[in-house]
From Swiss-Prot:
Record InterPro entries: Ribosomal_uL10, Ribosomal_uL10-like_sf, Ribosomal_uL10_bac, Ribosomal_uL10_bac_type
Name this protein carries in UniProt: Large ribosomal subunit protein uL10
Homology family: Belongs to the universal ribosomal protein uL10 family.
Pfam families, per the entry: Ribosomal_L10
Species whose genome carries this gene: Prochlorococcus marinus (strain MIT 9215)
GO molecular function, one term: large ribosomal subunit rRNA binding
Gene3D superfamilies referenced in this protein's UniProt entry, alphabetically: 3.30.70.1730, 6.10.250.290
Source organism phylogeny: Bacteria, Bacillati, Cyanobacteriota, Cyanophyceae, Synechococcales
Keyword Metal-binding included in the entry's annotation: no
Disulfide bonds: none
GO terms under biological process: translation
Key word Metal-binding present: no
Length: 175
């Protein structure tokens, strides 16, 4: 039995909501994957705040219609597609997808869309090599802390240096 029009509209609304919350979408050809393998992919993505949805291309087409951020996804809507929608840890999610593909050797990436732009395979691999947002923030915080420490030491050194100079000058004057 097919889906009702109301059910299809509900699915399209849900997909639109997921897309609005997502930073990146990766389209995978899931042909040949078992339910167990799809569950494995979903569990790997869960830790990176990614969602894997299998939906009809026609419903995805309706969900992206008129949305300038996701319109370019249209060119990838052929064949059997699983859509990985990534909310936050883009690099971690892409790493999880690549790890899954390496382990199963069944799925392949058709393409990805990030900030309204289609990405090439090499760009997708580059994203996977990036550190997570938390690691980058920690590096920035460390760098800022280092600068603040150096400034504090420098500021503290000016009066200390002046005091030493005055002391040396007074000792010379006394002798």
């Amino acid at each position: 039995m097919g889906r009702t029009l109301e059910n299809k509209q509900q699915i399209v609304t849900e997909i639109k909501s997921l897309l609005n919350d997502s930073e990146m979408a990766v389209v995978l050809d899931y042909k040949g994957l078992t339910i167990k393998e799809m569950s494995d992919l979903r569990s790997r993505l869960r830790t990176t705040n990614g969602i894997c949805r299998v939906t009809k291309n026609s419903l995805m087409r309706k969900a992206i219609d008129g949305d300038s951020n996701w319109n370019d996804l249209e060119s990838l809507l052929t064949g059997t597609n699983a859509f990985v929608l990534i909310k936050e840890d883009v690099g971690g999610a892409v790493k999880a997808i690549q790890s899954f593909q390496k382990d199963t050797k069944k799925s392949e990436t058709k393409g990805a869309l990030f900030e309204g732009r289609l990405l090439s395979d090499s760009e997708i691999k580059e994203i996977a090599s990036l550190p997570s947002k938390e690691v980058l923030m920690a590096k920035i915080a460390g760098a800022l802390n280092g600068v603040a420490t150096k400034i504090a030491i420098s500021i503290n050194e000016v009066p200390s240096g002046l005091a030493r100079s005055l002391k040396q000058h007074s000792e010379k004057s006394e002798s």
